């Protein structure tokens, strides 16, 4: 059985309350780990009550999370992990460059991802993983003018004032209950931050899987991942991979209308075996009924 879950409902319908109930049950009745991506800071009191770690991430905090951290076992069945990691990095540059990310840029990014990771993989994942700072340096070494466009566009997020994901991770993420609070991350960093933290969570899932430990992942406001193609592909891949690594993933959102405009989001909804629908707006209710083939009676 696919244990992944989607919870939908308008603001105030009880989504957060139902998730908190489930988290409490998991913590009190199992030895599993629970990881929460919390864009609104809604889970902070509960995390504190259960002795969990609250990692507060903002442009002004001292917390650093390396966007390019990668655990052994990142890809399926011993396959080359770089195609998947390259897609993740492309999703980051998609946030940075928006509609200006062209085919030439994508080729350069893929080439440079291969270059900075090969030594790390060849070493058996020993030592420090590369960082976005290393990647930017590799991009600058490329001869194409498009490479310089990439390096300049990414400067704010790599060597500028919003560089919190461009350096080595400096925070302990090993508490059984860990929440990533990104309430104060700011508009510019929020989409990129959600991607990086979700990637960090995925690396933790891999660690736990290799240690024989189950992980529950709760992602609030996950509809944001369906705004951009590469981010969508990354989220869908993680949605599939987490359950293969003894994890359960829950997506939570009130933006049902936004999800229903995405073909991939509709596919997720139509193929989820565990779907919780709380109070919906009239238009969303009708659209969900049509998508899921729910009759009026």
Region locations from a protein language model:
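Conserved AAA+ ATPase "sensor/coupling" helix adjacent to the nucleotide-binding pocket
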Residues: 71, 291-296
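P-loop NTPase motor domains
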Residues: 1, 41-53, 57-61, 66-247, ...
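Conserved beta-strand-loop-alpha-helix hinge in the C-terminal portion
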Residues: 282-292
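A short helix-turn-beta junction within AAA+ P-loop NTPase domains corresponding to the substrate/partner-engaging
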Residues: 51-55, 263-278
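Hydrophobic "anchor" residues on beta-strands that sit immediately upstream
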Residues: 34, 216, 250
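H-loop/switch region of ABC-family ATPase nucleotide-binding domains
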Residues: 253-254
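Glycine-rich phosphate-binding loop of nucleotide-binding enzymes
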Residues: 1-59
């Amino acid at each position: 059985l696919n244990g992944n879950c989607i919870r939908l409902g308008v603001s105030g319908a009880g989504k957060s309350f139902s998730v908190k109930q489930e988290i409490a049950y998991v913590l009190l009745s199992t030895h599993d780990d629970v990881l929460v991506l919390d864009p609104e800071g809604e889970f902070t009191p509960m995390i504190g009550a259960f002795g969990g770690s609250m990692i507060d991430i903002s442009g002004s905090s001292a917390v650093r999370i390396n966007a390019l951290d990668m655990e052994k076992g990142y890809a399926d069945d011993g396959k080359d992990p770089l195609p998947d990691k390259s897609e993740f990095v492309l999703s980051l540059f998609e946030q940075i460059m928006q509609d200006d990310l062209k085919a030439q840029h994508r080729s350069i990014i893929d080439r440079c991802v291969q270059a900075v990771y090969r030594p790390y993989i060849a070493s058996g994942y020993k030592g420090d993983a590369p960082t976005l700072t290393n990647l930017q340096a590799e991009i600058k070494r490329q001869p194409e003018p498009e490479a310089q466009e990439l390096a300049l566009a990414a400067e704010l997020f790599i060597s500028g004032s919003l560089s919190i994901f461009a350096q080595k991770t400096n925070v302990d993420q090993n508490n059984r209950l860990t929440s990533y609070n990104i309430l104060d991350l700011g508009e510019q960093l929020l989409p990129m931050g959600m991607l990086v933290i979700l990637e960090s969570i995925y690396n933790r899932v891999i660690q736990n899987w290799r240690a024989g430990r189950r992980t529950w992942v709760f992602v609030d406001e996950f509809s944001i991942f369906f705004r951009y193609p590469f981010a969508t592909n990354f989220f869908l891949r993680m949605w599939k991979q987490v359950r293969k690594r003894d994890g359960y993933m829950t997506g939570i959102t009130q933006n049902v209308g936004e999800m229903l405009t995405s073909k991939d989001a509709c596919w997720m909804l139509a193929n989820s075996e565990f779907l919780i629908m709380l109070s919906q707006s009239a238009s969303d209710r009708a659209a969900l009924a049509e998508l899921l083939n729910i009759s009026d009676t």
